[in-house]
Amino acid sequence: MVPTSVTRRYQDLASKRIDLIFFESPEWGWKNTAHEVLGLGGTDAEVYVARNLPGRDQHYFDDFDGKRLALYSGYHYGFADFNSDRDYLRQHFKAEFSYSHDSNLLKVLHDRADITVVAESFLQLFLDKNPGSAQQLLVSTRKDQVYHHQVLLRPESPVSAKELGRLLERLRASGELKVLLQRYHLHASH
């Protein structure tokens, strides 16, 4: 395991610092980095989250004009046509950035941001740890994006996509992959 960041991961794969990266999507800025793709078998979705206030409903998420957005730096969001450039997001949306989904949810809860965007799986993990927050949050039924988690590998990685696929298939066949995905509130897609 090698630590990397959201923005550095492209360079790390290209420079051979890492061989593969789990829970990725080729749609998240990988077009200029050589890679192979292997389906992981899990799906997730990004949802909008705001404070649950009297009179506020799902229409609150229809328009972001004038609303303060708490976003994860380097992430690609559907509402912004997957443009992750901070300057673009600040200019076109009232966006502030952090490196913590917990922090972004707390900003919403403490009225320091109006909306954040998080994966449904992360939101459920957050609510597992903070059950009292569930009534305080309004979660959109509209998804920012739905994605199938994948593994991205360097073309000359010591572990080939075919070999990793065989290992994942063994986990899938034994039911272990489904159990692992469910532990993190991910939906098995196979």
Predicted regions span which residues?
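Acidic, polar ligand-binding/catalytic clefts
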Residues: 2-64, 76-77, 141-143
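Short, well-ordered beta-strand segments
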Residues: 70-71, 116, 152
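Ligand-binding cleft/hinge of the Venus flytrap
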Residues: 38-40, 65, 73-98, 126-133
